[in-house]
């Protein structure tokens, strides 16, 4: 029986030393699922609310005992006796019980942890892997693929204490024939980059997502360093390895002046000027994907950016869409970007996450599954990427066990599925590429 008999919440620690919510869901047949909510550093203003205690005397106000109390109290009471396999029903019960637009009463961190734990318990009860259960919930049973990783090997912005304003410089092993081979290629470039940075006198300390966080003279210098690292590792840029960036431009947008300020290199841009700045980088390097290239509220600027670059490369909305189908629907209607970043905790439940992925795919958008800067050992996003055949995943660099946990889970899944889960490389990325 997959009937829920116990729901338990607790406060645990994330990869940045901040508390987060972990939940357990126990079923009548002895099955148990456990999951933890991640937490972001650069967050969209329209994300579902992450409930924090606000008690400055405890964890600097970042405790999550209120959210844990919600799990152990009203959420547990509402879910006990329900069928864990009926994910949509469970999620709707929690959403209705919370009763707010952005899950402000219980916190998206509480609802999400329980939502994912219930899915894991249901998979155990069905005696299937989590990715298989997710495929069932997605209405695509038995349809899988291994995701092309976006590996964040230079961290800037809110993810690092350095002079680099653009938040993530990533590599994608598009020339690999399997995920395992792609992971190896990424690791080799990562270690090659360490040598390049050291030789130039830069620090090889890492940021929140495991990438290096050097002080560089410009954002373009990050791309130049990666170019050298790729060549030194024995790979060809544009053939074996392509590049991607997450600008997280809301973090350097000045709302008072309406300007984009790259303080690290002393430059200021209007929205159109910044779009042309990005176009220049795309013309210089094989960049196939740019995320959050403008402020989350700059829809006119995004329209211009999409007209300028949307036929050439993948333009990903993260802070722009916050995994929210209502906002995504507007983007699709207005022709804004061509891809969405998928983060569980931006919306706060598995069911709503699956709905966002489906809406994106139905509209011809790509969907990139993503971690957050504050992570745990929980590797659910690996199963989500495979179980929805999303095609791409962002889960950091090749260091820090909170990042590597997801890669290791993907290795296990590929081993189990073999040819049933193809690795499609650059075919998964939106754009027309002529390198």
Swiss-Prot record:
GO terms under cellular component: cell surface; extracellular region; phosphopyruvate hydratase complex
Question: InterPro entries, alphabetically?
Answer: Enolase (IPR000941), Enolase-like_C_sf (IPR036849), Enolase-like_N (IPR029017), Enolase_C (IPR020810), Enolase_CS (IPR020809), Enolase_N (IPR020811)
* PROSITE patterns per UniProt: ENOLASE (PS00164)
Q: Where does Mg(2+) bind?
A: 246, 291, 318
Task: Name the catalysed reactions.
Answer: (2R)-2-phosphoglycerate = phosphoenolpyruvate + H2O
Give the pathway annotation. Carbohydrate degradation; glycolysis; pyruvate from D-glyceraldehyde 3-phosphate: step 4/5
Report if keyword Lyase is assigned: yes
Q: Which residues act catalytically here?
A: 209 (proton donor), 343 (proton acceptor)
Q: How is the cofactor bound?
A: Binds a second Mg(2+) ion via substrate during catalysis.
Subcellular location(s) of the protein: Cytoplasm; Secreted; Cell surface
**A Pfam family matched by this chain, by name?**
Enolase_C
Q: Which GO terms describe its biological process?
A: glycolytic process
Cite the EC number. Answer: 4.2.1.11
Query: What is the uppermost EC class here?
Result: lyase
Please tell me where (2R)-2-phosphoglycerate binds in this chain: 167, 343, 372-373, 394
Keyword annotations for this protein, in alphabetical order, are: Cytoplasm, Glycolysis, Lyase, Magnesium, Metal-binding, Secreted
Molecular function (GO) terms for this protein are: magnesium ion binding; phosphopyruvate hydratase activity
Q: Required cofactors, per record?
A: Mg(2+)
Self-association and partners: Component of the RNA degradosome, a multiprotein complex involved in RNA processing and mRNA degradation.
Cited PANTHER family: ENOLASE (PTHR11902:SF1)
Instruction: Give the family this protein belongs to, as stated in its UniProt record.
Output: Belongs to the enolase family.
Please explain the role this protein plays, according to its UniProt record. Catalyzes the reversible conversion of 2-phosphoglycerate (2-PG) into phosphoenolpyruvate (PEP). It is essential for the degradation of carbohydrates via glycolysis.
Q: What is this protein called?
A: Enolase
User: Which organism's genome codes for this protein?
Assistant: Psychromonas ingrahamii (strain DSM 17664 / CCUG 51855 / 37)
Q: Which gene encodes it?
A: eno
């Amino acid at each position: 029986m997959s009937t829920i008999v116990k729901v338990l919440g607790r406060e645990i620690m994330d990869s940045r030393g901040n508390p987060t919510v972990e939940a357990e869901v126990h079923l009548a047949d002895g099955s148990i699922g456990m999951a933890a909510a991640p937490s972001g550093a650069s967050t969209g203003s329209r994300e579902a609310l992450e409930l924090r205690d606000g008690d400055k005397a405890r964890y600097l106000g970042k405790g999550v005992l209120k959210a844990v109390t919600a799990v152990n109290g009203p959420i547990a009471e509402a879910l006990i006796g329900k069928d864990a396999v009926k994910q949509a029903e469970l999620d709707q019960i929690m959403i209705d019980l919370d009763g707010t637009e952005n899950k402000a009463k219980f916190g998206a961190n509480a609802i999400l942890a329980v939502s994912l734990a219930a899915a894991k318990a249901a998979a155990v009860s069905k005696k299937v892997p989590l990715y298989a259960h997710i495929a069932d919930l997605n209405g695509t049973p038995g349809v899988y693929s291994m995701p092309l990783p976006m590996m964040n090997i230079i961290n800037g912005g809110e993810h690092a204490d350095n002079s680099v304003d653009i938040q993530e410089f990533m590599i994608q092993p598009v020339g690999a024939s399997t995920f395992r081979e792609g992971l190896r290629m990424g690791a080799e470039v990562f270690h090659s980059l360490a040598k390049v940075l050291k030789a130039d006198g830069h620090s090889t300390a890492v940021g929140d997502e495991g990438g290096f966080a050097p002080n560089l003279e410009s954002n373009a210098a990050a791309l130049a360093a990666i170019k050298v690292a790729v060549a030194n590792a024995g790979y060809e840029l544009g053939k074996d390895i392509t590049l991607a960036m997450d600008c997280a431009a809301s973090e350097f947008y000045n709302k008072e002046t309406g300007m984009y300020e790259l303080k690290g290199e002393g430059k200021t841009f209007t929205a159109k000027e910044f779009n042309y700045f990005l176009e220049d980088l795309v013309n210089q390097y094989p960049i196939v994907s740019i995320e959050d290239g403008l402020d989350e509220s700059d829809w006119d600027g995004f329209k211009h950016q999409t007209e300028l670059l949307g036929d050439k490369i993948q333009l990903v909305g993260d802070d722009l869409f916050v995994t929210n189908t209502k906002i995504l629907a507007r983007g699709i209607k207005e022709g804004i970007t061509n891809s969405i970043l998928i983060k569980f905790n931006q919306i706060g439940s598995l069911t709503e996450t699956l709905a966002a992925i489906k809406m994106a795919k139905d509209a011809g958008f790509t969907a990139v599954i993503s971690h957050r800067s504050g992570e745990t050992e929980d590797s659910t996003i690996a199963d989500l990427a495979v179980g929805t055949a999303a095609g791409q995943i962002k889960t950091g660099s090749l260091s820090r066990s909170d990042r590597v946990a997801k890669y290791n889970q993907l290795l296990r899944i590929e081993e189990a599925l073999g040819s049933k889960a193809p690795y499609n490389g650059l075919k998964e990325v939106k754009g027309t590429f002529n390198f």
